[in-house]
């Protein structure tokens, strides 16, 4: 598989630097976070980095599937919601972390669950950008970001094949 014309391949080193840059931006706003909500699966890696840098210990996941194959976004499916304890007060004092906001559909779904939370993503595209409070890099809507966990020397199919949601 060859990369599309507007491809943005991200190495592990680059992603780590960008996630730390996100943590710096969040630290600069002086907010004390009572919890972090990580959007799986893409938000797991930046959440680990940001939670370390900001010393956030209470970490929750929200599991939403929208890409049911590699490159086609489908209907949103909430596989695991947010605990009532984290969701209280509309998510006040909660930091939501994801790798990317693309079309904004996933971000809108999580924003509806936690309307008072702060949404941070490492990368943002124009359609999703209005839903993000803090991000590091904006890329054009027609650029495909290749994250390091998706790549070998070429695109790598997951070991477990088939769609599980």
From Swiss-Prot:
Its EC number is 2.4.2.-, 2.4.2.22. Keywords: Cell inner membrane, Cell membrane, Glycosyltransferase, Magnesium, Membrane, Metal-binding, Purine salvage, Transferase. It is an enzyme of class 2 (transferase). GO terms for biological process: GMP salvage; purine ribonucleoside salvage; XMP salvage. The keyword Transferase applies. It is a peripheral membrane protein. GMP binds at residues 102-106, 144-145. One of its GO terms (cellular component) is plasma membrane. Its cofactor is Mg(2+). Xanthine binds at residues 102, 145. InterPro entries: PRibTrfase_dom (IPR000836), PRTase-like (IPR029057), Xanthine_Guanine_PRibTrfase (IPR023747). It catalyses: GMP + diphosphate = guanine + 5-phospho-alpha-D-ribose 1-diphosphate; XMP + diphosphate = xanthine + 5-phospho-alpha-D-ribose 1-diphosphate; IMP + diphosphate = hypoxanthine + 5-phospho-alpha-D-ribose 1-diphosphate. Guanine binds at residues 102, 145. HAMAP family: XGPRT (MF_01903). This is Xanthine-guanine phosphoribosyltransferase. It comes from Rhizobium meliloti (strain 1021) (Ensifer meliloti).
């Amino acid at each position: 598989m060859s990369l599309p014309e507007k491809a943005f391949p991200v190495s592990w080193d680059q992603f780590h630097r960008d996630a730390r840059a996100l943590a710096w931006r969040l630290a600069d706003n002086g907010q004390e976070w009572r919890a972090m909500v990580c959007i799986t699966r893409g938000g797991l890696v930046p959440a680990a980095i940001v939670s370390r840098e900001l010393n956030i210990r209470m970490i929750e996941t929200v599991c939403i599937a929208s890409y049911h194959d590699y490159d086609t976004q489908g209907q949103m499916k909430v596989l695991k919601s947010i605990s009532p304890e984290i969701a209280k007060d509309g998510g006040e004092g909660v930091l939501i972390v994801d790798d990317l906001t693309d079309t904004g559909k996933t971000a809108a779904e999580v924003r509806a669950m936690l309307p008072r939370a702060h949404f941070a993503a490492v990368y943002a595209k124009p359609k999703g950008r209005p839903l993000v409070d803090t991000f590091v890099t904006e890329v054009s809507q027609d650029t495909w970001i290749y994250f390091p966990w998706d790549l070998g020397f070429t695109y790598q199919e997951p070991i477990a094949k088939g769609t599980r949601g």
